[in-house]
C-alpha cells in the first residue's frame, strides 16, 4: 500500500546520499501497515482433504470469523463448516516429533473458529502419498461454548470443500538471492569476465515467483474488489489481482507473515 511505503521512508529517514537499506525493513513496514488494514480470510494453498468421521453427513454450520481483530468495528463474516474440509498438507504429519502441535494421529488440534478435533489416521494412494486425513470432533468445543476453553496447543485453518472457491495464488518473493545486487554484480563480472546481463542472471532468485493453480479460499473472498488487502491466516498478506474473475480468482502475495529470508541467512 502507499501507506506502507511512507512507513518505510519514516523508518530509514531522509538522506541526500546513496544509501543501502535492508530489504527486511521494507517488509517490516509492509507487515505493520497491512496488519492494520487487511481483512482476515482462510485459504488453503497446498490442500489435502480432512474428513470428520463422526460429523453428520449433509450437515452445514455457519461459523463466525472476525474480519479484522485490529478493528472490531469492522464486524464478522460467516464461514461454512461441514464434514469434509480442505486443510494444509503441511499441517499434517503421520510420524510427528514430540513438539509437533498440528495434526497427527492421536493428537488434538483446534480448527479455527470451529471445533477441537482429534486425528485418527490417514489414507494413502499406491505411491504412498497422503490423500485423506481423518479425525473426530468434540461437539462441546464449538467456538463460543464453555468447552472451547479446553487447552489445545495447536490451531489450524481450513475451508469447507463444498463451500469454497478455487483460486490461483501467485507467491512473489525477492527478485535477487543476494542482499547487495549492485556490489555482487560487479564482483561476478570481474570474476567471470562476463557482461552485466549474464551476471544478473546468476543473482536471480529461482523462487521469486511460484504459481499455485489449484488453491481454495472461503466464499467470502468472492466479493473482494481488485487490489483489496487480505491476510490469508497463518500464511501472509495478499491482494486480489486484476486478472481475477468470478469463475477463477487470482491472488498475489505481498509479503509473508514472517521474515523467512532472515532465518535462512542466519
Regions found by a protein language model. Name each.
Residues 1-266:
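Polyanion-binding catalytic cores of nucleic-acid enzymes and NTP/SAM-utilizing transferases
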Amino acid at each position: 500500500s502507499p501507506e506502507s511505503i511512507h512507513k518505510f521512508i519514516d523508518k530509514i529517514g531522509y538522506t541526500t546520499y546513496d544509501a543501502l537499506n535492508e530489504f527486511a525493513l521494507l517488509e517490516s513496514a509492509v507487515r505493520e501497515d497491512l496488519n492494520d488494514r487487511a481483512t482476515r480470510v482462510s485459504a488453503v494453498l497446498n490442500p489435502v482433504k480432512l474428513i470428520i468421521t463422526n460429523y453428520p453427513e449433509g450437515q452445514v454450520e455457519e461459523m463466525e470469523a472476525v474480519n479484522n481483530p485490529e478493528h472490531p468495528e469492522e464486524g464478522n463474516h460467516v464461514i461454512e463448516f461441514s464434514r469434509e474440509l480442505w486443510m494444509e498438507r503441511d499441517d499434517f504429519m503421520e510420524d510427528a516429533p514430540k513438539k509437533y502441535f498440528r495434526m497427527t494421529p492421536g493428537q488434538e488440534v483446534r480448527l479455527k473458529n470451529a471445533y477441537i478435533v482429534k486425528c485418527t489416521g490417514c489414507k494413502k494412494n499406491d505411491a504412498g502419498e497422503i490423500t485423506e486425513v481423518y479425525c473426530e470432533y468434540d461437539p462441546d468445543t464449538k467456538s463460543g461454548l464453555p468447552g472451547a476453553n479446553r487447552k489445545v496447543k495447536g490451531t489450524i485453518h481450513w475451508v469447507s470443500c463444498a463451500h469454497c472457491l478455487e483460486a490461483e495464488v501467485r507467491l512473489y518473493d525477492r527478485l535477487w538471492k543476494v542482499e547487495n545486487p549492485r556490489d555482487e554484480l560487479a564482483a561476478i563480472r570481474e570474476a567471470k569476465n562476463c557482461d552485466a546481463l549474464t551476471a544478473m542472471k546468476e543473482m536471480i532468485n529461482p523462487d521469486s515467483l511460484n504459481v499455485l493453480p489449484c488453491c481454495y479460499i472461503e466464499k467470502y473472498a468472492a466479493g473482494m474488489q481488485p487490489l483489496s488487502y487480505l491476510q490469508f491466516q497463518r500464511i501472509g498478506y495478499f491482494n486480489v489481482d486484476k486478472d481475477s474473475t468470478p469463475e477463477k480468482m487470482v491472488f498475489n502475495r505481498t509479503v509473508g507473515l514472517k521474515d523467512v529470508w532472515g532465518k535462512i541467512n542466519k
